[in-house]
Amino acid sequence: MSMQIIDPHVHFFNLVEGQYTWLQGENPPAWPNLEKIKKPISAEQLVGSTDFELTGIVHIEAGFDNQSPINELNWLSSHLKNLPFKAVSYNQIDSPTDQFKSALNAQTHPSLCGIRDITEGTDAKRLLSANSFKNLAVLSNNQLHFEAQFNIENSDITKQVAYYAKQLPQLQIIINHAGLPSDLATWQQGV
């Protein structure tokens, strides 16, 4: 019998129904495997691609429809009928709190377990906003986690996220992509 696992960071893409402006727009990333990312994959193909027994996944948003993120959650429900899953959706972390709450309420779905807002590079400064702290408290109060995607080498942002974690001890914060390391020594200091 193979080892049972839950894959905690999976992206399914539906380039027909989804928007993915970062992937299909005028300036897609210059990644070497971009065409593989664009290829549609079924849950069955994912399960069959590993020697592990995949008992569940956590799907992380990737820009399906950031104006109406519930559309991605609904699509996932139809696409992943035979695989237990939870989903992390999009919500702008530094938006006014009433707007953040309204957007969160519009995403009510049994699979929703957290929120991600990509704050890489200069976007990281949005994590310094007072609204970010208020909205993280909303997530904590709703038992939803925050998927933080920022360069951990940015010490000001890393210190701020650590401060939030201390102030909101019930909030789960997950650092995406290992904090996007580019300089190992600086990254280690950030960790």
What is each residue range found by the language model?
Residues 6-10, 56-60, 85-89, 113-117, ...:
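Hydrophobic faces of well-ordered beta-strands that scaffold small-molecule active sites
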Residues 77-80, 108, 165-166:
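N-terminal cationic-hydrophobic initiation segments that often serve targeting/anchoring roles
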Residues 128-191:
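Catalytic pocket-lining loop regions of alpha/beta-barrel enzymes
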Residues 53, 83, 108-111, 169:
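Short loop/turn motifs at secondary-structure junctions
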Residues 40-49, 68-76, 95-107, 130-132, ...:
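Short, acidic/polar
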Residues 95-147:
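Hydrophobic alpha-helical segments and helix pairs
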Residues 1-82:
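An N-terminally biased module of ancient metal coordination in phosphate/nucleic-acid-related enzymes
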Residues 63-70, 91-99, 122-128, 151-158, ...:
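Acidic-and-aromatic substrate-binding clefts and catalytic sites of carbohydrate-active enzymes
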